[in-house]
C-alpha cells in the first residue's frame, strides 16, 4: 500500500463515515484526511479543515434530563485501541450497533489500519490521537474531542506499557517514570478532565472503566509472583518519580524494576477507580468499575519480555493453568463491563473464571486501602497539574 503524506503535522482524529472511504476530521485548521478508493490500493493523507462527522446510526436511550428517548448511539472512548484487548473491545462494542467507538491511540495510522483489518464497519468508529506519555497530549485530546461535538457516555482507560526486563527507567515527556506515567498519571488526568463530559451525558448508564490486573492484586497466586507489587508509603511518587537524586519507583526503592513498576501502576489504577467511586458516584450516578478480563497470554503487552517467556507462556496458560483467554473473548468481557445493563454496580472489580459469568472479585488489602487511595489521589493531582 503506497502512502502519500501532504501535511507534516500530528494527526488528531479520524472517522469513517461510509464504507470504503476514510476521512479524518477534527475542528482545527490542519487535520489529516485519509481516503481509500476501492480500485486502487493506495492511501492518501491530506490536510483538510472540516467539521467532525456526526455519530453514526442511532440507538435508543432514555434521557436523564427530560425522560424522553435519546435516539443516538452511545459514544465510548477507549485508550490503546489499536491492538490487543483495546482493539478487541472496540470491535465487540462496534458490532453491537449500539456504540460509536473513539479509538484514542498514540499511533494514528496504525489504529486506522487495525480497525479496517479487524473488519470494523465504516462509520462505527473514530480514531483520535492520544499520547498518554505527554500530559499536553492528554489535554489536547480532550480539547479535540470536545470540538468534535460528540457526547461522552463511557470512558475506558485501557492502554498500558509493560517493560518487565528493564533495569533502568525511561521517562515521559513530563519527566515521570514511563510505566506509572502512562498507565496511571496519563489516565488519571484524562479521567479527571473527561469526568465533566460524562456528567453532561444524557445516556442512561454512564461508565468510567479502568483496567486492573491480577498481577497487582497480592491476594492471588499470580499477584505473589516476584517482584510483588507494593506502593509502600508512596515516597517515590511524592518525590516525582524522577530517578535523578530520587527514586523512579513509587515505594522509593533505590533500584529500578520494570516488572514491579508495571504492577505498582495497576494498584494505582484499582485504587483510583475506588476513589472516583467514593467521590463522585453518589453525586453523579456514574458507574466506576475496574476489571481483570483474564490472562491474554498472546497479547502484545508481553512484546518486551524475554523470547523464552513469550514462547512458553501461552501454552502454559492454555494447558496447565487453564487460564488462557483469547483477545476476542477478553474484548467481549470488557465490552460487557462497558455496556451490559446488569453490570451497573459502581466501585466493583469484575473478574471471570474459565467459562464463568462475571463476578465481583475481592481486591487485596493494599489495592482497596481508602487512606492510600486518598493519598495517591492528592499526589497525582499535583503531579498532573490539577492543583
UniProtKB/Swiss-Prot annotation:
Family named by the database record: Belongs to the short-chain dehydrogenases/reductases (SDR) family. POR subfamily.
* Task of the protein: Phototransformation of protochlorophyllide (Pchlide) to chlorophyllide (Chlide).
Q: Which gene encodes it?
A: PORA
- In which pathway is this protein known to take part? Porphyrin-containing compound metabolism; chlorophyll biosynthesis
| Targeting signal (transit peptide) range | 1-35
- Name the InterPro entries on file: NAD(P)-bd_dom_sf, Prochl_reduct, SDR_fam
Q: What is its main location?
A: plastid
GO biological process entries: chlorophyll biosynthetic process; photosynthesis
Q: Which CDD domains match?
A: LPOR_like_SDR_c_like
Organism of origin is Oryza sativa subsp. japonica (Rice)
Keywords assigned by UniProt? Chlorophyll biosynthesis, Chloroplast, NADP, Oxidoreductase, Photosynthesis, Plastid, Transit peptide
Catalytic activity from the UniProt record: chlorophyllide a + NADP(+) = protochlorophyllide a + NADPH + H(+)
Which protein are we looking at?
Answer: Protochlorophyllide reductase A, chloroplastic
Any one Gene Ontology molecular-function term assigned to this protein's record: protochlorophyllide reductase activity
Q: Return the broad EC class.
A: oxidoreductase
> Subcellular location, in the record's words?
Plastid, Chloroplast
Amino acid at each position: 500500500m503506497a502512502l502519500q503524506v501532504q501535511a507534516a503535522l500530528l494527526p488528531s482524529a479520524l472517522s469513517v463515515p461510509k464504507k470504503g472511504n476514510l476521512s479524518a476530521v477534527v475542528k482545527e485548521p490542519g487535520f489529516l484526511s485519509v481516503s481509500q478508493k476501492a480500485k486502487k490500493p493506495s492511501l492518501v493523507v491530506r490536510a483538510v479543515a472540516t467539521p467532525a462527522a456526526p455519530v453514526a446510526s442511532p440507538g435508543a436511550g432514555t434521557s436523564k434530563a427530560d425522560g424522553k428517548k435519546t435516539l443516538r448511539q452511545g459514544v465510548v472512548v477507549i485508550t490503546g485501541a489499536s491492538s490487543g484487548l483495546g482493539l478487541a473491545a472496540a470491535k465487540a462494542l462496534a458490532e453491537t450497533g449500539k456504540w460509536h467507538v473513539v479509538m484514542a491511540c498514540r499511533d494514528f495510522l496504525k489504529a486506522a489500519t487495525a480497525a479496517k483489518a479487524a473488519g470494523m464497519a465504516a462509520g462505527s468508529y473514530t480514531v483520535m490521537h492520544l499520547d498518554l506519555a505527554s500530559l499536553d497530549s492528554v489535554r489536547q485530546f480532550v480539547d479535540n474531542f470536545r470540538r468534535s461535538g460528540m457526547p461522552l457516555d463511557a470512558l475506558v482507560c485501557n492502554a498500558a506499557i509493560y517493560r518487565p526486563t528493564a533495569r533502568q527507567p525511561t521517562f515521559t515527556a513530563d519527566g515521570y517514570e514511563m510505566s506509572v506515567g502512562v498507565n496511571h498519571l496519563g489516565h488519571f488526568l484524562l479521567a479527571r478532565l473527561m469526568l465533566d463530559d460524562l456528567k453532561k451525558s444524557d445516556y442512561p448508564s454512564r461508565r468510567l472503566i479502568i483496567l486492573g490486573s491480577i498481577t497487582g492484586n497480592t491476594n492471588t497466586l499470580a499477584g505473589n509472583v516476584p517482584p510483588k507489587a507494593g506502593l509502600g508509603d508512596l515516597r517515590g511518587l511524592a518525590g516525582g518519580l524522577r530517578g535523578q537524586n530520587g527514586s523512579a519507583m513509587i515505594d522509593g526503592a533505590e533500584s529500578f524494576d520494570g516488572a514491579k513498576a508495571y504492577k505498582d501502576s495497576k494498584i494505582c489504577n484499582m485504587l483510583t477507580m475506588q476513589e472516583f467511586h467514593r467521590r463522585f458516584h453518589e453525586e453523579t450516578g456514574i458507574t466506576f468499575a475496574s476489571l481483570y478480563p483474564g490472562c491474554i497470554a498472546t497479547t502484545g503487552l508481553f512484546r518486551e519480555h524475554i523470547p523464552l517467556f513469550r514462547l512458553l507462556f501461552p501454552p502454559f496458560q492454555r494447558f496447565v493453568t487453564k487460564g488462557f483467554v483469547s483477545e476476542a473473548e477478553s474484548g467481549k468481557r470488557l465490552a460487557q463491563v462497558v455496556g451490559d445493563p446488569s453490570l451497573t454496580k459502581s466501585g466493583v472489580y469484575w473478574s471471570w473464571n474459565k467459562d464463568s459469568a462475571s463476578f465481583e472479585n475481592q481486591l487485596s488489602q493494599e489495592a482497596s486501602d481508602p487512606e492510600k487511595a486518598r493519598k495517591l489521589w492528592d499526589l497525582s493531582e499535583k503531579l498532573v497539574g490539577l492543583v
